[in-house]
């Protein structure tokens, strides 16, 4: 048996046992027909969207990693729903991030790779929708869908901060920072960003509501972020709020504090840093979950978690980071680049111990949150939305989703034009590299994409190729202005 599969079975059993041990009150409510989740559903629940950066499917306890310590994420999965097959809209950061906010494929809104654009104000985002119902909205962490400093000049991208897209408050960086001491280039780092020991990218990367932040920026970067999240939650405990928290962890430069590295004495240096910074992030997620319970608002707060794509190329190839056995990694159209760890928690609404292998995606966040907080009518009919409402799936009313999923990553100047479509159990992909081949896989029989059926199944190849072309053409019309008034 595949080692990760064996670990996954063990992890799943532990999740169920944890749920049974810790959720008796929720179960009792479920058994009482007069105390159903639907009848107790808040009309304006709080929404928290958590996202890690470059965390592989196999780099979390609830997906079977027996070494990496993520007790709070494991607790979330146990208390709510664990998504076994949750896909990022693209195999890298910026395109996926936009999909989380818009419910649309990256090829629709024109962010096709990292640092190649910025979020257009014509897009309708989750915070813009929720503000119409008097939600307070805030963003924390890595933005990466536009510059956050007005005077920042670059050959790629443009100024498009969170405040242009519905967020009342923000504490954000444009892109990556070291995961420990985020303002300083770490020891031994010899790539982009700066010289060892010098200021990271020449200065202070965080901007808070338009002003460069210069206080409380030392130590674990996830703690630096959460120190801004907690006051926002406390200040808005009596009114509905949206908190979008996008951690930098575990994106390179991957650095952990000594106390976190010591948790993994038998791991190599690279894995000590990777595991250490993920555990530090998990600790801050636990801090947030504890605060919700302290304030007594956990039952009117839904919390989502996912990664933005698979693990970084180098860390995956060296076996430091894990895709859980799935082929590929970040920057590839294989499932190792697209499948990410994901879960959601809403005590009293999402049954504890829920697990689904239905294929879900980051494009599903907007229609799900709109359905929960506003109703389906809140979505503009003139604006194509590619996601679906996941609440019926998360509450056990349906088992599967009948839809196709499209993924893309394009940087034509480098010959990169990666695309993929999943239709039913079949996946067609065009490799994201110059001269990349077209591949066809039956994921029901070949989840690790080892047996290319493009030559053996020409009819299936033709059908999926046509579907892919139709979706891409629709996205190009959106990207060229069909969805906006000029």
Residue locations for each model-derived region?
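Accessible peptide chain termini
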Residues: 1-2, 486
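Bacterial N-terminal signal peptides that target proteins for export
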Residues: 2-15
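Formylglycine-dependent sulfatase
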Residues: 17-432, 436-439, 443, 447-473, ...
């Amino acid at each position: 048996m595949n080692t990760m599969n064996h670990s996954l079975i063990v992890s799943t059993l532990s999740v169920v046992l944890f749920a049974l041990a810790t959720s008796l009150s929720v179960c009792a409510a479920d058994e009482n027909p007069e105390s159903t989740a639907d009848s107790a559903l808040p009309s304006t629940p709080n929404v928290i969207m958590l996202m890690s950066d470059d965390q592989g499917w196999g780099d979390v306890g609830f997906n079977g990693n027996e070494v990496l310590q993520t007790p709070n994420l494991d607790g979330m999965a146990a208390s709510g729903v664990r998504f076994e097959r949750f896909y990022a809209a693209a195999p890298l950061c910026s395109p996926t991030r936009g999909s989380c906010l818009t419910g649309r494929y990256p090829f629709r809104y024109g962010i096709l790779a990292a640092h190649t654009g910025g979020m257009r104000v014509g897009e309708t985002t989750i915070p813009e929708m929720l503000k119409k119902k008097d939600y307070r909205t805030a963003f924390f962490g890595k933005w990466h869908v536009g510059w956050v400093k007005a005077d920042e000049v670059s050959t790629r991208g443009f100024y498009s901060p969170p405040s242009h897209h519905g967020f009342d408050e923000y504490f954000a960086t444009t892109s990556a920072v070291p995961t420990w001491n985020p303002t300083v280039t770490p020891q031994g780092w010899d790539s982009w960003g700066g010289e060892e020991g010098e200021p990271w990218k020449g200065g202070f990367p965080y901007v808070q509501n338009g002003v460069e932040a210069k206080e409380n920026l030392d130590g674990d970067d996830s703690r630096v972020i959460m120190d801004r999240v907690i006051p926002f939650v406390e200040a808005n405990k009596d009114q509905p709020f949206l908190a979008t928290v996008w951690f930098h962890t575990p994106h390179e430069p991957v650095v952990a504090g000594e106390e976190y590295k010591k948790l993994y004495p038998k791991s190599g240096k690279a894995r000590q840093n990777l595991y250490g910074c993920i555990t530090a992030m998990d600790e801050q997620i636990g801090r947030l979950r504890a605060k919700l319970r302290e304030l007594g608002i956990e039952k009117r707060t839904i919390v989502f978690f996912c990664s933005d794509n698979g693990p970084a190329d180098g860390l995956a190839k060296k076996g430091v980071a894990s895709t859980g056995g799935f082929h590929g990694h970040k920057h590839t159209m294989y499932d190792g680049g697209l499948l990410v760890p994901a879960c959601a928690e809403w005590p009293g609404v999402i049954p504890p111990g829920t697990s689904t292998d239905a294929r879900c995606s980051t494009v599903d966040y907007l229609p799900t949150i709109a359905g929960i907080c506003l109703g389906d009518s809140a979505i503009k009919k003139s604006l194509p939305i590619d996601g679906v409402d996941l609440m019926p799936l998360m509450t056990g009313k349906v088992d599967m989703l009948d839809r196709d999923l499209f993924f893309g990553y394009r940087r034509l100047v480098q010959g990169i034009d990666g695309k993929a479509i999943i239709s039913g159990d079949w996946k067609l992909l065009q490799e994201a590299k110059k001269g990349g081949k077209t591949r066809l896989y039956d994921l029901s029989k070949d989840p690790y994409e080892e047996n290319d059926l493009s030559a053996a199944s020409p009819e299936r190849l033709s059908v999926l190729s046509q579907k892919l072309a139709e979706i891409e053409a629709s996205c190009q019309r959106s990207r060229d202005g069909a969805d906006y008034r000029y």
